[in-house]
Amino acid sequence: MRPSGRDLSEMRPVSIETGFTKHAEGSCLIKMGDTHVLCTATIEDRVPPFIKGSGLGWVTAEYGMLPRATNTRMRREAASGKQGGRTVEIQRLIGRALRAGVDRVALGERQITVDCDVIQADGGTRCASITGGWVALRLAVNKLMKAGDVISDPLVDPVAAVSCGIYAGQPVLDLDYPEDSEAGVDGNFIMTGSGKLIEVQMSAEGSVFNRAQLDQLLGLAEKGVGELVAAQMAATA
């Protein structure tokens, strides 16, 4: 039995509220159970120096957590003068994931920065950030298209992510924090709306796993991502 009482293949309730902030070109508040993330997308008419003059666009991301997003207060990273390794890893992951669904030629020589700020954390913050980040990106690109600044849609496929793991010896979908902290195997699956894999992060946290278990987790991830993409489509329709 899962602590939440959910079935093994049951997602937490998902909601996506768009237009959550008024200044950003795209924004949403995504809730996956008790994990809540504010995602905004900002369009800038510049690109990093390494692609300047190439005609290619760029999508990047930044990630952070509010001090009281967790059970005990975390010190703001700004107060220590540097980002932690976990933060850097996650924001690079978000940027990589979102770029996988973008035609950078069609985007043109501009940059879109997706900011993901965790308001409340209960497991799966990077997955919620990727899923909500794509919605914010979609809304920002819609504005570019409406203004005629891009000719064809640069977003070629939705991108979403979900966690899967082995908890109490059973493969489970969309781990919350109590499950994540005790899982024998923990993984994150990032996929496109068409079912292609972008990235898989899997690790043995207390027990090893075999190919059959990996296939079970992949099947759960496909189900979960399908539900998340449906939520993305409904939010951006």
Swiss-Prot record:
The keyword NADP does not apply. Its EC number is 2.7.7.56. InterPro entries: ExoRNase_PH_dom1, ExoRNase_PH_dom2, ExoRNase_PH_dom2_sf, PNPase/RNase_PH_dom_sf, Ribosomal_Su5_D2-typ_SF, RNase_PH, RNase_PH_bac-type, RNase_PH_CS. GO terms for molecular function: 3'-5'-RNA exonuclease activity; tRNA binding; tRNA nucleotidyltransferase activity. The keyword tRNA-binding applies. It is an enzyme of class 2 (transferase). Phosphate binds at R86, G124, T125, R126. It comes from the Bacteria. PROSITE patterns: RIBONUCLEASE_PH (PS01277). Keywords: Nucleotidyltransferase, RNA-binding, rRNA processing, Transferase, tRNA processing, tRNA-binding. Pfam families: RNase_PH (PF01138), RNase_PH_C (PF03725). It catalyses: tRNA(n+1) + phosphate = tRNA(n) + a ribonucleoside 5'-diphosphate. One of its GO terms (biological process) is rRNA catabolic process. Disulfide bonds: none annotated. NCBIfam families: RNasePH (TIGR01966). Homohexameric ring arranged as a trimer of dimers. Belongs to the RNase PH family. Phosphorolytic 3'-5' exoribonuclease that plays an important role in tRNA 3'-end maturation. Removes nucleotide residues following the 3'-CCA terminus of tRNAs; can also add nucleotides to the ends of RNA molecules by using nucleoside diphosphates as substrates, but this may not be physiologically important. Probably plays a role in initiation of 16S rRNA degradation (leading to ribosome degradation) during starvation. This is Ribonuclease PH. It comes from Ruegeria pomeroyi (strain ATCC 700808 / DSM 15171 / DSS-3).
